[in-house]
Amino acid sequence: MGIFSGLFKSRDKPQNSYDSPSYTYFFGRANSGKRVTDRTALQHIAVYACVRVLSEAIAQLPLHVYKYNEKGKERVPQHPLYFLLHDQPNPEMTSFVFRETLMSHLLIYGNAYAQIIRNGRGDVIGLYPLMPDKMKVDRDEKNRLIYIYSRYDEANPNLKEQGDIVLYADEVLHIPGLGFDGLVGYSPIALAKNAIGISIACEEYGASFFGNIVLSRLGFAFFQTFGSVQSSDSSAP
């Protein structure tokens, strides 16, 4: 049984992007001394432009539901999921806004999550985005994937109570980006935080430099004017 023991052992837990010891360099202080987070990174014009352009481009692409038959595949506009994906995934969002939101999450955090809402018969009736920075991917005692979501200041109307909630794989639409285990993606912002930190530092230095020049010129102009007034007063009889 020794040769086959490796085939039947349980899979390792997913390498969670946010609390894994091997990924302690997630959002945080860069070598430039600047703290790089999802919010500060988006204030950098290059990061914001990339996220905006890619998110809007993906959100504009056509999204249809197909089924396979003996001739290949055909579009199925009457399928129940067609309306959710193509038109309105939930009463608060259009398909464009929903896909734009998920794509921006994927670009910033490396993962995009959406809660799958079902009716009593098990039919999917809604999709709501979940914030990736509040999600932890793990395995339960039966080695099943679980999603532990922290409900603090939550905007999702389906998660009203505060605290942690456990969602199973059939309750979450998870789109991971590039990662080492194929389950959890790594944040592009975190991986490039030193480059972004340098850009933020340069922007702040430039703004401070030009701000000091303006103040210096104002001070020089003030003293020039004040000095000329004093001179004219002293020369008066």
Language-model regions: role of each:
Residues 1-237:
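Structured, contiguous alpha/beta core segments that scaffold functional sites
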